[in-house]
């Protein structure tokens, strides 16, 4: 029991937080700085912006920010190329328009409109 408490104490005192971001290769990623006076530790080009934000080019990279209070924020960017899966998802959305439920509701609305128009003409 003492060992478990000791290990949890070590984990909480190290204060290392991990952040994961997935992006499309070649685009720019906009992230928020974890602390305003942090020290950047990494080999990727870092572009500080207004409102405690920064921009990085999306490549598979690993970098960190060390804050003044001792907290370390580790970031992992995972670059992916555009895959055909994105286009498959769009086709699935278009097919949902012609689902059986939609067709049943459309047929009912059509029949109701036909009967109400027929009654008005009589």
Curated annotation (Swiss-Prot):
Highest taxon in the source lineage: Viruses
Record-annotated disulphide pairs: 23-58, 35-67
Residues in compartment: Intravirion: 118-122
Cell location: Virion; Host endoplasmic reticulum membrane; Host endoplasmic reticulum-Golgi intermediate compartment membrane; Host Golgi apparatus membrane
Sequence motif: Di-lysine motif, positions: 118-122
Record field: transmembrane: 97-117
Virion surface domain ranges by topology: 16-96
GO cellular component: host cell endoplasmic reticulum; host cell endoplasmic reticulum membrane; host cell endoplasmic reticulum-Golgi intermediate compartment membrane; host cell Golgi apparatus; host cell Golgi membrane; plasma membrane; virion membrane
Leader sequence segment: 1-15
Alphabetical keyword list: Disulfide bond, G0/G1 host cell cycle checkpoint dysregulation by virus, Host endoplasmic reticulum, Host Golgi apparatus, Host membrane, Host-virus interaction, Inhibition of host innate immune response by virus, Inhibition of host tetherin by virus, Membrane, Modulation of host cell cycle by virus, Signal, Transmembrane, Transmembrane helix, Viral immunoevasion, Virion
Residue ranges occupied by any X4e domain in the UniProt entry: 16-81
Major subcellular location class: virion
Example of a GO biological process term: symbiont-mediated perturbation of host cell cycle G0/G1 transition checkpoint
Membrane topology annotation: Single-pass membrane protein; Single-pass type I membrane protein
Family matches, as InterPro entries: ORF7a_SARS-CoV-like (IPR014888), ORF7a_SARS-CoV-like_X4e (IPR044871), ORF7a_sf_CoV (IPR036495)
Known partners and oligomeric status: Interacts with the spike glycoprotein. Interacts with M protein. Interacts with E protein. Interacts with the ORF3a protein. Interacts with human SGT. Interacts with host ITGAL. Interacts with host BST2.
Domain notes: The di-lysine motif confers endoplasmic reticulum localization for type I membrane proteins.
Protein name, as recorded: ORF7a protein
Organism field: Severe acute respiratory syndrome coronavirus (SARS-CoV)
């Amino acid at each position: 029991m003492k060992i478990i408490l000791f290990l949890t104490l070590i984990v909480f005192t190290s204060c290392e937080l991990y952040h994961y971001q997935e992006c499309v290769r070649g685009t720019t990623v906009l992230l928020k700085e974890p602390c305003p006076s942090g020290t950047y530790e990494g080999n990727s080009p870092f572009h500080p912006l207004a409102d405690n934000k920064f921009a990085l080019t999306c490549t598979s990279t690993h970098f960190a920010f060390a804050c003044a209070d001792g907290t370390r924020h580790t970031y992992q960017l995972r670059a992916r190329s555009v895959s055909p899966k994105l286009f498959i998802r769009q086709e699935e959305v278009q097919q949902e328009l012609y689902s059986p439920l939609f067709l049943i509701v459309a047929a009912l609305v059509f029949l109701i409109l036909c009967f109400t128009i027929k009654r008005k003409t009589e």
